[in-house]
Amino acid sequence: MIVQPKVRGFICTTAHPEGCARHVGEWINYAKQEPSLTGGPQKVLIIGASTGFGLASRIVAAFGAGAKTIGVFFERPASGKRTASPGWYNTAAFEKTALAAGLYAKSINGDAFSDEIKQQTIDLIQKDWQGGVDLVIYSIASPRRVHPRTGEIFNSVLKPIGQTYHNKTVDVMTGEVSPVSIEPATEKEIRDTEAVMGGDDWALWINALFKYNCLAEGVKTVAFTYIGPELTHAVYRNGTIGRAKLHLEKTARELDTQLESALSGQALISVNKALVTQASAAIPVVPLYISLLYKIMKEKNIHEGCIEQMWRLFKERLYSNQNIPTDSEGRIRIDDWEMREDVQAEIKRLWESINTGNVETVSDIAGYREDFYKLFGFGLNGIDYERGVEIEKAIPSITVTPENPE
């Protein structure tokens, strides 16, 4: 069938299989063109492996270091006239290309927060790898979590803490810049967001992997966070998500102590740059900030996407054969170019004057839109979007059954 983008609010409800495959192919080509990673990881588990930083780290591990990879995610196969989710198509393309290159690549589709999926993953690691996982990437972005032990349901929210936040935001599709006010979160919303987006599940994963002897001596585990400039702090760093990320950082310190003493391992937080993702598109203020950031970083020739960021994380931080450079809080900073003084000063200056009339020229909102559509496989060169495509795509390692998530 012919697949066109259908955008509702912050998400696109369709995905293009060939476009997603082309996008994954571009990332793979980038990883292959860079000099290969020496001393890189060999057996990598990526939790949240189908889009964004998780997918990019899977590609860098596989095609940059020749690593075997297992990816865990929660995606939807095609059903009737409904396309699969982009992460499904991304993984189908990744696995197909990895297998053709002689690389081990298997995936598990289901709720990463559940004990059942953790056990399935452990069983696969024991059966196929006999343990020995030397890198665990934790890259989950989810709006809700069911606690595996208590059954309690938590929903995350994106709100300020303490007082109403007033600023401006942009409707990315129309280019309309307007004032926005966001009411503060309740105590329950703060706690719930921490339960979903904090470090609780990361710790459950690492403890389970350790208990069943799945981790190698010297293992590294990395989770991602974002800090950003003062401009976004009220809604992000000092808001509910920021509170959850502080919990994630606290978890990293605890896991680091455990892994260091048991396996000479490390648990690390990587602070990444602001990028267009399905998650960031839903945050008020942030799309307008990213549109300005893209413009300035592209002009200075320091713009990076997910794949460039993950390449730099692996090459210059995790596997540089030197001590991993961190900030005073022990975090890896690959948001260093975004947070450069000259970049931030320019954004601050433009922020005051940006409005509906000048947003298309002052910012790179066109680049934001382009990246947004690319997430769903649209707007890629060399794809004929007027031609019908087969929307059912198989992921080689996954058997689709009616019980699989819809």
Swiss-Prot record:
Catalyzed reactions per annotation = a 2,3-saturated acyl-[ACP] + NAD(+) = a (2E)-enoyl-[ACP] + NADH + H(+)
Q: Does the keyword Cell division apply?
A: no
Q: Pfam families given for it? A: Eno-Rase_FAD_bd, Eno-Rase_NADH_b, Enoyl_reductase
Tell me its EC number(s), please. Answer: 1.3.1.9
Q: What class of enzyme is it?
A: oxidoreductase
**Sorted alphabetically, which keywords does the UniProt record give?**
Fatty acid biosynthesis, Fatty acid metabolism, Lipid biosynthesis, Lipid metabolism, NAD, Oxidoreductase
Q: Which residues form the active site?
A: 236 (proton donor)
**InterPro entries reported for this sequence:** Eno_Rdtase_FAD-bd_dom (IPR024906), Enoyl-CoA_Rdtase_cat_dom (IPR024910), FabV-like_NADH_b (IPR050048), Trans-2-enoyl-CoA_reductase (IPR010758)
- GO MF annotations for this entry? enoyl-[acyl-carrier-protein] reductase (NADH) activity; NAD binding; trans-2-enoyl-CoA reductase (NADH) activity
Q: GO biological process annotations for this chain's record?
A: fatty acid biosynthetic process
This protein's pathway reads: Lipid metabolism; fatty acid biosynthesis
> Sorted alphabetically, which HAMAP family does this protein's record hold?
FabV_reductase
Q: Which family does it belong to?
A: Belongs to the TER reductase family.
Official protein name in the record: Enoyl-[acyl-carrier-protein] reductase [NADH]
Taxonomic source organism: Coxiella burnetii (strain RSA 493 / Nine Mile phase I)
